[in-house]
A protein has these predicted regions:
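Glycine-centric low-complexity repeats
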Residues: 2-375
């Protein structure tokens, strides 16, 4: 069903028009006693919250200062109402675009009854908005006005902000939002902050051996240190026959021994990086018209990268490890709440506003069940 229009009137569509009838019709706060013609002039004062005969398109025939006649009262109206029926859903309801017949900025007392649902699927657009001048308007909410919840934070680090529920920016006088006990004006929740990347795993130190020989000689073993720092002898320098030999007569002998080459070894260490840290988890999405049920928890972080190890090397000096798991993303915000923070460098997303920005009063049943979010 479409948004419908109802009026208090038109009155005096035919027949005689008496002052007593006009008094009963238009001066509702004092329907007894006499009423003068001056009281029945069309009141165009935009700041008057209770005009006797209001300024309205339908009342344009009624004089405002002089030349008033009873005939001008014919087909006049007192109040002007619009109603969104229960069961209807309007996305991004443009209040000032409805069938006000030019009366939105006039001082006729008006009411917009929102009995269905207003919602938004975009955080950049409020669920319902009034962007033009309005006077003497009551928005009576017995249904729902739900802002858009922020999408999950898939890139980081900051969570996205939730969307507003009701936006009133046109200005004017006597603008009220009246909440029935069944009414709900809920701002969209912010998204959780993206989880931080997990830390890298412990590096491992692997080693290989480098082998070289150093020539020995007569009476001496080769010096492994001549190869450079870190070389040590692990073998060689075995006897390989005499040297520096001589004989006298029947005796022959060697004063020294030839030695085989010195067998040298050096341990060469290589640092192998630990496994890379796992990706941080996505921040949870915020509650909103676009996500009224379901989990708003942040996603689990990714597993850390595998550690390559010392395969292909001779051995291990110190052991390394796999990368650490990424941090779980922050939870999204419930209606009108911020997304949760993590240890990452950003913040969870802010919630939208229940009603924004200024220039209105909130009446009726106002509690944590009927409004979620700031106003």
């Amino acid at each position: 069903m479409a948004i419908s229009v109802t009026k208090s009137g038109p009155y005096f569509t035919s027949g005689a028009i008496s002052f007593s009838a006009m008094r009963s019709t238009f001066r509702l706060n004092n329907p007894t006693g006499t009423i003068s013609a001056s009281e029945l002039l069309r009141d165009t004062n935009a700041s008057n919250s209770d005009p006797i005969l209001p300024d309205a398109t339908e009342n344009s025939d009624v004089a405002t200062s002089t030349n008033w006649k009873t005939s001008q009262i014919r087909d006049s109206i007192k109040f002007y109402n619009l109603t969104q029926p229960s069961g209807d859903t309007n996305v991004n309801l443009d209040i000032d675009a409805q069938a006000w017949n030019g009366n939105l900025g006039r001082n006729i007392v008006k009411k917009l009854n929102l009995e269905g649902t207003c919602g938004s699927n975009s955080t950049s657009q409020s669920a319902a908005q009034l962007n033009q001048l309005a006077n003497n308007l009551t928005i009576d909410v017995s249904g729902d006005i739900f802002g858009c919840g922020a999408d999950a934070t898939v890139t980081g680090p900051d969570g996205l902000d939730g969307g507003d529920a009701l936006e009133i920016t046109g200005g004017g006088n006597n603008i009220k939002i009246n909440l029935q006990s069944t009414g709900r004006i809920y701002a969209g929740g912010g998204a959780g902050e993206h989880g931080a990347v997990g830390s890298d795993g412990q590096s491992e130190t692997c080693f290989d051996y480098i082998f070289q020989n150093v020539n020995s000689g007569c009476g001496f073993c080769g010096d492994c240190s001549s190869l450079g720092s870190g070389y040590t002898r692990i073998g060689g320098c075995n006897g390989a026959g005499g040297c520096n030999c001589a004989g006298w007569g029947w005796w022959y002998g060697c004063r020294q021994t030839n030695l085989t080459a010195a067998e040298c070894r050096k341990q060469e260490n290589t640092v192998v990086a630990g496994g890379t840290g796992g990706a941080g988890g996505d921040g949870g999405r915020g509650r909103g018209f676009n996500f009224q049920s379901g989990s708003i928890a942040g996603a689990t972080g990714g597993a850390g990268g595998a550690f390559a190890g010392c395969g292909g090397f001779t051995g291990t000096v110190t052991a390394g490890s796999q990368g650490n798991t990424g941090e779980t993303g922050g939870n999204g915000g419930e209606w009108g709440e911020s997304g949760s923070n993590t240890s990452n460098t950003g913040d969870g997303g802010d919630p939208g506003k229940a009603i924004t920005p200024t220039g209105f009063t909130v009446t009726g049943t106002v509690n944590s069940s009927t409004i979620k979010g700031s106003y």
